[in-house]
């Protein structure tokens, strides 16, 4: 979950 960008699944 990134902020400001496209939400990527953070592990």
From Swiss-Prot:
Alphabetized UniProt keyword annotations: Amidation, Neuropeptide, Secreted
Pfam family for this entry, one: Periviscerokin
Any Gene Ontology biological process: neuropeptide signaling pathway
Domain of life of the source: Eukaryota
Record flagged with keyword Kinase: no
PTM sites of type Threonine amide: 11
Keyword Secreted (UniProt): yes
Tissue localization of expression: Expressed in abdominal perisympathetic organs and abdominal ganglia.
Function as written in the Swiss-Prot or TrEMBL entry: Mediates visceral muscle contractile activity (myotropic activity).
Record-stated family: Belongs to the periviscerokinin family.
Protein name: Periviscerokinin-3
